[in-house]
């Protein structure tokens, strides 16, 4: 590549994958709080399993992309969907 665009197949430098994963998980937690969606119990279980296995948030997002997309679509959360798309296409 001759341009300055970060290439995830070469390095994750300059992409801020961990920071973006943290932001998305914060957005998820905020949406889950006080929510009666069927997704809340699902994500609570998956987040607990992820923590128990010692996996990071980026690993969690990679494993849950489709479920996260469905939940954020259900919640009409365009910002979370945009960030999820960015993570999926630049970090996973």
From Swiss-Prot:
Keyword Membrane found: no
GO biological process: nitrogen fixation
The keyword Nucleotide-binding belongs to this UniProt entry's keyword annotation: no
Keywords: Nitrogen fixation
Family according to the record: Belongs to the CowN family.
Summary of the function given for this chain in its UniProt record: Is required to sustain N(2)-dependent growth in the presence of low levels of carbon monoxide (CO). Probably acts by protecting the N(2) fixation ability of the nitrogenase complex, which is inactivated in the presence of CO.
Protein name: N(2)-fixation sustaining protein CowN
Gene responsible for this protein: cowN
């Amino acid at each position: 590549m001759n341009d300055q665009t970060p290439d995830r197949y070469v390095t994750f430098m300059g992409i801020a994958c961990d920071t973006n994963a943290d932001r998305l998980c914060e957005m998820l937690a905020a949406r889950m709080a006080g929510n009666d969606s069927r997704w809340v119990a699902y994500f609570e279980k998956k987040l607990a399993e992820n923590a128990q296995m010692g996996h990071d948030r980026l690993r969690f997002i990679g494993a849950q992309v489709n479920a996260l997309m469905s939940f954020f679509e259900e919640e009409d959360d365009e910002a979370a969907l945009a960030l999820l798309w960015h993570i999926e296409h630049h970090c996973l």
